[in-house]
Amino acid sequence: MANVMIQYTEQGELSLYLAKKDLEEIVTAIEFDQEDKWGGELVLANGAVYFVEPYPSKPKLPISVRARRLQAA
C-alpha cells in the first residue's frame, strides 16, 4: 500500500499524486462518488487502477490516503 494525495487540479479535475514514483494522473472514474460513500476503485488516465478504502462521507479535498494498486499502467 502506498500513501497518495487526492486533490483537484487547477482545471477542476480530480487527480491522484503518488510521491513514491513522482506520478500525478487524472482520475477518470471513481467507484463511489456520493455524499454518503466515497472511494473504492479509482481508474487513472494512464490505465492504472488503485483502491482506496471507502469513506462513509465525501471527504474535504485535498486528502492523503492509503491506496493499493490493483492494476499497473
Each model region followed by its residue ranges:
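N-terminal acidic leader/helix
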Residues: 2-31
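A general secondary-structure signal for short beta-strands and their flanking turns/coil
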Residues: 1, 11, 37, 60-62
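A short, sequence-level motif marking secondary-structure junctions
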Residues: 22, 31-37, 54-59
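Long, low-complexity, intrinsically disordered terminal regions
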Residues: 18, 38-39
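Intrinsically disordered, low-complexity regulatory regions of eukaryotic proteins
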Residues: 13, 36-38, 44
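Short, compact, well-ordered microdomains
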Residues: 41-73
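Residue-level detector of beta-strand structural context in well-folded domains
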Residues: 4, 39-40
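Short amphipathic alpha-helical surface micro-motifs
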Residues: 23-25, 32-34, 44-49
